[in-house]
Amino acid sequence: MGASDPEVAPWARGGAAGMAGAGAGAGARGGAAAGVEARARDPPPAHRAHPRHPRPAAQPSARRMDGGSGGLGSGDNAPTTEALFVALGAGVTALSHPLLYVKLLIQVGHEPMPPTLGTNVLGRKVLYLPSFFTYAKYIVQVDGKIGLFRGLSPRLMSNALSTVTRGSMKKVFPPDEIEQVSNKDDMKTSLKKVVKETSYEMMMQCVSRMLAHPLHVISMRCMVQFVGREAKYSGVLSSIGKIFKEEGLLGFFVGLIPHLLGDVVFLWGCNLLAHFINAYLVDDSVSDTPGGLGNDQNPGSQFSQALAIRSYTKFVMGIAVSMLTYPFLLVGDLMAVNNCGLQAGLPPYSPVFKSWIHCWKYLSVQGQLFRGSSLLFRRVSSGSCFALE
């Protein structure tokens, strides 16, 4: 995957984007009934409880607890919490960087090692390209272990900027309080909630993507210098100067449109699919205790099984939709390095593309729209062509 996070691996991406997908929590029917009864008499609704499913004691909402900030932290601890998020994100980014590095080199078509003959599950002879581990060993042989972390600095800065941007936006534009609904009878209300949540998440993702994309471009170009052994982009500040001098301001945003489209399609596809599956296929009345005895003895456990299923639904939908939107990621990364003076962005590795649509059509004709999506079992396709060193 080239990068995204704002680049993240599919499983991480699915978890982040699916926040709204299963936001429809359980128990809407009982809650709605209690609300109607409470409006007709005293005491207020907050003090009424469903006869079968007692309502827990009222807790302050997330917005009230953090003073309406809606950010990563709450109160005086917000800066510390946000710094912790940035630090954790930096650790994950550093650990996953070799994976992203190898993936990007495969995306641009750099195959320094010849394929090997193997057999598939049907026993047929096929040609396999080197796996991620073999490719990583090759990089270590050429550049040493430190070579696996080429381009890490701008990527760390990109992800940190994205995290801080999202946290700041939550403080400036705090999300509305979320009421959990999931019953089929409340489908219209639930769908409106999912649409509202997804729109909010889309706004944050698009803004953070646009602000962090220049650093993403620099990181991509630093990594693909491995192909031609160049040293054109050696630091963040010097890279900014080179890009601005050679390509102008637009040079920092090449490949942005396909990345934005991929993010938008992913968010809406993942959240809506998860919502409809959870609303129509997940039964809130299923108890996780035999015979349903747990409903009265432990009311809080009634919906634990349904909530667990919903969490798995979000995860699975995130992986499935991320696979479908992978071509947007590939095209965005290829455009970021295309015709920038590096060998990886010029023939024979890649033609000079006029636009990202031109790049998409070219990859589609070549059957390469999913190039780099698999890092373990990589078969040589009929339309593939790779360079040998």
UniProtKB/Swiss-Prot annotation:
Subcellular location: Mitochondrion outer membrane
Modified residues (Omega-N-methylarginine): R29
Bias kind Gly residues: ranges: 15-33
Residues in the Cytoplasmic compartment per record: 105-155, 230-254, 343-371
Residue ranges, annotated region (Disordered): 1-76
InterPro entries, per database record: Mitochondrial_sb/sol_carrier, Mt_carrier_dom_sf
The keyword Translocase belongs to this UniProt entry's keyword annotation: no
Keywords: Apoptosis, Membrane, Methylation, Mitochondrion, Mitochondrion outer membrane, Repeat, Transmembrane, Transmembrane helix, Transport
Residue windows of the Solcar repeats: 81-176, 192-280
Any single GO CC term annotated in Swiss-Prot or TrEMBL for this entry: membrane
Transmembrane segments: 94-104, 156-176, 210-229, 255-279, 323-342, 372-389
UniProt GO molecular function: membrane insertase activity
Protein's name in the database: Mitochondrial carrier homolog 1
Lineage: Eukaryota, Metazoa, Chordata, Craniata, Vertebrata
Gene: MTCH1
